[in-house]
Amino acid sequence: MPRQFPKLNMSDLDEHVRLLAEKVFAKVLREEDSKDVMSLFTVPKDCPIGQKEAKERELQKELAEQKSVETAKRKKSFKMIRSQSMSLQMPTQDWKGPPSVSPAMSPTTPLVLGAASKPGLAPYDMPEYQRATISGDYCAGITMEDYEQAAKSLAKALMIREKYARLAYHRFPRTTAQYLAHQGESVPLEEGLPDFHPPPLPQEDPYCLDDAPPNLGYLVRMQGGVLFVYDNQTMLERQEPHSLPYPDLETYIVDMSHILALITDGPTKTYCHRRLNFLESKFSLHEMLNEMSEFKELKSNPHRDFYNVRKVDTHIHAAACMNQKHLLRFIKYTYQTEPDRTVAEKLGRKITLRQVFDSLHMDPYDLTVDSLDVHAGRQTFHGFDKFNSKYNPVGASELRDLYLKTENYLGGEYFARMVKEVARELEDSKYQYSEPRLSIYGRSPKEWSSLARWFIQHKVYSPNMRWIIQVPRIYDIFRSKKLLPSFGKMLENIFLPLFQATINPQDHRELHLFLKYVTGFDSVDDESKHSDHMFSDKSPSPDLWTSEQNPPYSYYLYYMYANIMVLNNLRRERGLSTFLFRPHCGEAGSITHLVSAFLTADNISHGLLLKKSPVLQYLYYLAQIPIAMSPLSNNSLFLEYSKNPLREFLHKGLHVSLSTDDPMQFHYTKEALMEEYAIAAQVWKLSTCDLCEIARNSVLQSGLSHQEKQKFLGQNYYKEGPEGNDIRKTNVAQIRMAFRYETLCNELSFLSDAMKSEEITALAD
C-alpha cells in the first residue's frame, strides 16, 4: 500500500487549542525584545504551577474526588491495571526478558477484568541488581482527572511525533511505539532504521563513478515550497504526482498547535515536572545501590575500556574541525613551501601567497595562536556576531576564503588538505569518528556539483568521517543583495539538484557518489535572532515570500523537513541511502523551536532550552530523541559550564551525546572530542559507565551504517534494553542498560494504563 501523508483540516482543531497555541506564539514574540539574556536559562526549582492558588485548587479537586463515586470506580480499576503492569515490569528469578507482546494495550483494546498477560521468553538473561519500587498512590499531588488528561495528551503528542518520524524514515524507539500501538501489532524493523550507505570495502575505490543506477526520467516541479515528482509530462499536465507521501501544511499547523497547547497546560506541566524529578532521584538511588556492581561488571570485561570504545563527534563544523595550533601550523607550512604560488585573482590580476600576506602587512613566521585570534573568549559570551568573526584568522576574510572555503581560486585545496589531516588523526586513533558539516547556502543550484567535485577531486573520503550538509538561515542577506527573488527559489536551489541526482544519477554521477557519504541535513545560525512573523497556515508560501525579512525558525524547519521527507521516500524507492534532519535547536531563542524540532527532526544539537519546559523535556525523554550537547561551546557563548544540563539530562535518561561543535574556537588539544569527555568527567565526576554510555549513544545517534554499528556495538544494537547491548564492544554495564529500559517502560506504562483505565470504566458503565 502506498505511503501517504494523513491530512487534517483547521476545522478539526479545537478552538481552545488554537487559542492556546496562538497565545504561546504571541507571548514568544513579546518576550523576544524584552528578555534578559543572562537569565535565559534560569529556571525556578519549585513546581511550575506550585503557587499558593494552584495548590489550593489541587487540594479542592482532591477533596471533591474523594467524595465522587465515579472517581472511586476509576481509581479502583486503575490500581488493578497498575498492579498488573508492575508485575510485568518487575523481573522474577526465572524471567528472561520483556514480554513478547507489549504489556501496554491500545486504548481501543479494553483489558478483560481478571485476565493476566504472560511474559514471553527472550534470548538473554536479565542482570541481577537492586531495584527500587514505588508502591501506593499512583500520582500523589495530582488528581485522577488531571492525571488522565496529562497522560492522554502526552500519548497523543508521541503519536504525532511517530507519524512524522515514520513518514521521513527518521527513528522512533520501538519500545515507545509498542506502548502506543495496538496489542500484538509489531512495528517493522526496517521502518525504524534509516538507510545509510555502507563504507566501501578495502579493495573498493571510494570514488568509483560506475555504479550509478539507470535514469528514470521523472519530472520535478516545486509547488508551495515542496518538490513534487511526476512520472512524465502527461502526469504533470494532469497534476497527478508520483505515489509518494507529500506533506500538508494545514495538518502540520494542527499538529503543532496541539503540542503548543500541551506545553502550556498546568496539570500536564505539574505531572511532567514530578516525573522528571522522580527520574533524577531514581537514578541517584540506582547509583547508590548498584555503582559497585556496575564497576565490577566493567572490570570483568576483557580488552575493553573507555579509551577503546567507539565515540562519534556528532556535531562539528568542517570549517572549524581543526584546532587553532593545527591551523597556524598549516598556514606557516604553506607559506614556507609555496610562497610564490598563485592563490587568488583580483580584477584580472593573479595574486601569490606572499602577496596576500604582504597586503595584510604580516609575516606568517611571527604569527602565534594569540595573534591568529580564532579562539572564542569572554567577549563572545552572548555575542554570536563576535563569535562568527572568529572564523576569520587574524580578522582577515581573505585568509578565511583561502584556507577555510571549498570555493576559491585553488578549488578549496588548502581546506581539503587540512580536513584530510584531521581525518588521518581520527584514523590513527581508530576509535574516534566525526560528522563534519559542510555548507550549502541555496544561492545557486550549482553549489552541489561544485561541492561534489571538491570532495572527489581532492579525495576527501575517510572511513572515520560521515558528512552532514548545513543550510545557514540567512535568506534575508541574499535577498537584500538581490541574489534570490524569493525563499522558494532558495529551497529549489537546495533540493532540486538532489532530486535530479536521485532520478537521473547517470547524468549526475559526481553528486550521486558524494551523496553516498552524506547522512543528514542541519539548519544553522543564531537562534536568538528575533522574528516578527508567526508561522501559521496563513503564512505566505515560499514562492510568495519575497520580502527581505528572514522567515522564522519554524518556517525553515517545516519546509526543510517537507522536502527531505519526499526525497527520502523517493530514494528509498530507488534503493538509495536516506538522510536525517538534524538541526541546531534549543541553544537560544524561543521554546517553540523545540516544538518544531519535536515534529520534524530526527535528532537535535544543543537542546539547552529543554531545561525551561518540563513537558517538552519529558516528551524528548519518552521519544528518546537524540541530543548532541557541546558544553564547552555553550560555555563560551550562552551558558557557563557548571549550569549546563547535560549531567541532569543523562541522569534522567535522555539520549545525550558529547560533541565538540568548533574545535578551532573552543578546544586546545589535538583530540578535541577526548578533551570534551575529560572535562565533563572531571567537572561532573562521571563514572566510566557514564562515559561509555554517552559514547554508545553517540554511535547510535550517528550516520554510521547498519554494518558499522553492528561491528562497533554488537549484532543486536537496534534492540532496546540489555538485549541490544554487547558489553564486550560498548563497555556499558548490562545493569545500567536494564535500569534504563525498565525505567522507560515504567514511564510509558503510566500513559497506557491511564488510557486503559478510561476504557475499563466506560465498559463497566
Curated annotation (Swiss-Prot):
It is an enzyme of class 3 (hydrolase). The active site is at 606 (proton acceptor). Transmembrane segments: none annotated. The gene is Ampd3. Belongs to the metallo-dependent hydrolases superfamily. Adenosine and AMP deaminases family. Its EC number is 3.5.4.6. It comes from the Eukaryota. GO terms for cellular component: cytosol. This is AMP deaminase 3. Its cofactor is Zn(2+).
